[in-house]
Design a protein with these regions (language model features):
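PAPS/PAP-binding and catalytic site of the sulfotransferase fold
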Residues: 14-28, 96-100, 175-200
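PAPS-dependent sulfotransferase catalytic core
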Residues: 1-69, 76, 124, 211-215
Length: 267
């Protein structure tokens, strides 16, 4: 029987890199965002609506139905350990624990300003495509504001999701800092294996590759999920205006750095 674990956390923080590294292990299957979380959410809505027939669905049937979504989606994968990826899984820690009592969630994280900067850098490399990260891409201030929206923002929403999961079930979650993964990949991955309670696999950190052109084309951003060769840290040039840097730096949104589960409140 397959074991199912999860990857969530913040965007532009190494989740694709982490998946690519994990995939070197012949027992592991890890990929970027799957539709399983969305289908799970829709299924939960469907079987808990006011439809009279839903009252005949037992607790065991609900569990079997939802478990079947995972089993069916990954049925063709012959590897014994699956890592499913979604930014929303940290909002469903109680659900995941009930379905997979052993499971854990790996959550890559990074400084918020660095994430915004990374999105701006990568999107600037596709100048002939509309930026799909924000509805209003007239200027960098509007883009960052929309990316940080707590409900729909590509950065703000995952940040709130992560805080929810870490506040309710912190023992299920390992926060994997991007810089640590890049600077000390072996040390970081040994900590990951220890957290997962799996025997360590000797990875080749000089030859890590991954790409998904289909997904990236859907986002109108080339190389959004591309990993090439050696794992190393290359500090990017900051292209954000100083006003934006100061605004989000002063908010101290990186709750994992000061070990406080603070309320995230920002405009």
């Amino acid at each position: 029987m397959k074991q199912t674990y999860f990857i969530s956390g913040l965007p532009r923080s190494g989740s694709t890199l982490l998946s690519a590294i994990l995939n070197q292990n012949s027992d592991f299957h890890a990929d970027i965002a799957s539709p399983v979380e969305a289908v799970t959410r829709m299924s939960l809505d469907a079987i808990t609506s006011d439809n009279a027939s839903n009252f005949t669905v037992s607790e065991e049937q609900r569990k079997n139905l939802l478990y079947g979504l995972f089993d069916g989606y990954y049925k063709h994968i012959e590897k014994p350990v699956i890592f499913d990826s979604s930014r929303r899984w940290t909002t469903k820690t109680n659900f995941l624990r009930a379905l997979f009592p052993y499971t854990k969630i790996l959550c890559p994280v990074r400084n918020i300003v660095s994430i915004l900067n990374s999105f701006e850098i990568i999107s600037s490399k596709s100048p002939f495509y509309k930026n799909t990260l924000a509805d209003n891409d007239d200027n960098i201030f509007e883009r960052c504001k929309q990316m940080m929206d707590k409900t729909y923002g590509v950065v703000g929403c995952p940040l709130v999701n992560l805080l929810e999961g870490y506040s309710s079930n912190p023992e299920m979650i390992m926060l994997v800092e991007y810089e640590n993964l890049c600077k000390e990949p072996e040390k970081t991955m040994k900590e990951v294996y220890k957290f997962l309670e799996k025997p360590y696999y000797k990875h080749d950190f000089d030859n890590v590759k991954y790409s998904n052109e289909t997904f990236d084309n859907a986002c109108n951003i080339k190389n959004l999920h591309t990993v090439k060769n050696k794992v190393e840290y290359n500090p990017p040039k900051c292209i954000l205006p100083q006003e934006i840097v100061e605004k989000y730096s002063e908010m101290n949104l990186e709750f994992w750095k000061n070990n406080t589960q603070k309320k995230i409140a920002y405009a």
